[in-house]
């Protein structure tokens, strides 16, 4: 009997741990947000130009680089908003009608990096994520798509974009988060939403 109870307890605890895996390791948003806030004047300017909430931009800066304009990741994402020249950078250049992609030095320039990051968020919102009605669900969808691609997110709902958007519009923000936690192939996707909320709460 004791052995059976112990086995049940182990399974229960394992389930609880798995449910909140996105909170590990712990992340304190206070210092990253303080450092990201120093760029708020640029974020406000870029947000106005691209119709993006400056607080969302600031939260992404806090999460991605901790406010360090010279940050470079192992995957070669660069600057405050950790943009990759060959993907998001190229998409922004295309939107602007330019050829090629941004240089590393350009991406390390705070004003250029934030402007391109805001532009990329606008590309996501008006492109693959167009049609999402709930503002908070859209915000969650934006950050997951920013980090892991819009296609990966939409495919967790349907291979057809319109059907995926329809299904997303049936969900509350909490339900959307639960869906991402259970179905997104990237384990960091729900963690990004969790970090977003912590960063916004610090502002």
From Swiss-Prot:
UniProt keyword terms in alphabetical order: Cell outer membrane, Cell wall biogenesis/degradation, Lipoprotein, Lyase, Membrane, Palmitate, Signal
Short name of any one Pfam family annotated for the protein: SLT
Gene3D superfamilies recorded: 1.10.530.10
GO CC terms: cell outer membrane
Signal peptide start-end: 1-15
Membrane-protein topology: Lipid-anchor
Subcellular location: Cell outer membrane
N-palmitoyl cysteine lipid attachment residues: 16
Gene Ontology molecular function: lytic endotransglycosylase activity
Catalysed reactions, as listed in the record: Endolytic cleavage of the (1->4)-beta-glycosidic linkage between N-acetylmuramic acid (MurNAc) and N-acetylglucosamine (GlcNAc) residues in peptidoglycan with concomitant formation of a 1,6-anhydrobond in the MurNAc residue
Keyword Cell wall biogenesis/degradation part of the UniProt annotation: yes
Main localization category: membrane
HAMAP family referenced in this protein's UniProt entry, alphabetically: EmtA
Name listed for the protein in its UniProt record: Endo-type membrane-bound lytic murein transglycosylase A
